[in-house]
Amino acid sequence: IVTSLGVLTAVATLLSGGVTTAYANDALANPNSAMGYPSFKGAADPIPGTGVAFDPSTSYLKQVFDADVANGAGTDTAHDFWIDKMLTRTGTAPNGTGTNDAGDYNYAGADKNEYLFSRGRAAFMYTHTPEALGFVGDVAYWDQTGNDGFTVEVSIGGSKQTLRENTDKRKQTPSYFTTEFTNGDKTITVTEVKYITYTNVMVANFTITSTTGGDVTLTAASPFAQDGNDGDTELTGRFNVKNDLTTIYPRFSGNGFTVKDGKLASTLTLEANVPQTTKLQLGLIANELPDSTAEYEARFNGDLTDPAASYKDSVTTYNQWWVDNIPYVETQEHNIDKTVFYRWWLSRFNMLDANMPGNTFQYPTSIEGVLGYNNQIVLTSGMFINDTKWFRNAEYSYGTWVSAGQTAKKGQSGYYYYHDNPGDPANWNHSYTQYITKAGWDSYKVHGGPSSLAEALGDYGSEDVKGLLNSQSEPDSNDNQNSNGNKLIDWSWWSMTGNDADAVSFSEPGRSGQRMDRADGSANMWANANAAAQAYKAAGDTEKAAEMQQIADAIKQDVLDNLWDSDSKLLLHKWLNDGQFAKYKDLNNYYPYADRQ
């Protein structure tokens, strides 16, 4: 947990490989086991049974997956894969009300199970309106488009039906979403199952039942695809995504649907109480992702036209990814285990793998909050790398630090320092505190690779550290991080720490806007410099390794010489204008103790 927060330098072990120095303050330590477990609420056992005995000699997740397939997983929404079952949400929970150890609570920001978990490599729902048929809300292709995916109307005898969602039928797993609708007199029931395939095809299956029988017409429209002649079997379009990072070529079709007036229409003849199933698919096709065409065409006129086959292919592919990529984790507390799997899902959900042209998102890249800031923000990149380095496919962790290195900003000094991805300069276009090189080096120690890759990591880290140490005249004052020319990072704004208003050390009365040498940013910079030295050493570049180690040692010495307060026996931030230590302490004062290298 500590290394996820920040990083870096253990003052107590900084100087001599574990030997306590004069800078350290002896203190009592309590074992973590003394803390006990928190009080958990919810399901009595949050981990569903697998029916599979654990065998450490083989892949447990593969055994569970195979058992799921044998038991019909993927054939319908009543037969789920194990991780889908574990992370299922039903109804409109969480609704923001409940009781915990502190009493009753009411949280107005609860999501009510409305966000769509299913996503593709680049496509997802930034906002989602589940009470409407289709993909209604703000579709994102890497970021918001401002458009619905597609809408669907149901008509009987030319009369549009008003459908109401039965929210108690709402069910969501990471791989699909399903719910049920009825019309006013309850003569029509529509069960919807929707999902986004790996390569960005948005599919909705509709099972329609009529208590009376007769013709039911479905009319579907998509702002992405409106070109086509009446009688055609698909609509097409062209769309430049946000900031013109790429162009997609949407294709829209459905089983038995034909074009009429720029929309798709299909009339089903139903027998009373005999359900019929059909489907619609919107492919967000990108030239740089040729599989997006293949996945769409398989559902348009290929071997996945059948709704059940399309669904099974998508959810099976989704769940196979877990087997291929994540390690199995089990503790003595199943509530913790579920949190671990949920965290794996978060790492996956917040991954953009768009293979875009240009120098923005050409690599798989972890994104800070695809439903929020939605950019590769350097502040959190290290945290994501620390998690994704455990994925078996190295591209997920390597992609993030390679992307940061390739999109680094050239400073006035001529060095390139890590900077928020230029694909979305609105969020936030700064160089916040970060430990990307350190996290990248940790990922390299897990996965390895050619010496050229280690050399590249060393180069990225070297440029970043030198760029920050020489940042005195950047156009954006927030990117000036060493105003006094020493070996310490200085800031005047709490957001640079990532803790925002929780970085209370900035809040001394009369000190607003003043700069201080920081223990946290300097510790992170030391970690990056030290990691760059280690990467160069692994690459066999001893000259550059020695140079970066010298810089790392100089940073360490400046931290100890300038930020150690012998009275409080703690590293404190220090104001530049008068050399006084900051009066207020915060979590960030402890960053230098957080990692023992």
What are these regions (language model features)?
Residues 334-356, 388-391, 395, 409-413, ...:
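Active-site acid/base region of carbohydrate-active enzymes
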Residues 23-334:
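Terminal accessory carbohydrate-recognition/targeting modules of carbohydrate-active enzymes
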Residues 273, 277, 281-304, 369-370, ...:
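The feature captures the catalytic groove of carbohydrate-active enzymes
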Residues 311-455, 459-463, 572-597:
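Substrate-binding groove/exosite segments of carbohydrate-active enzymes
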Residues 1-11:
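Sec-dependent N-terminal signal peptides
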Residues 14-26:
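Sec-dependent signal peptide cleavage junction
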Residues 137, 142-150, 175-177, 400, ...:
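Amphipathic, well-ordered alpha-helical segments in soluble domains
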Residues 202, 209-220, 535, 547-550, ...:
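Beta-rich accessory regions
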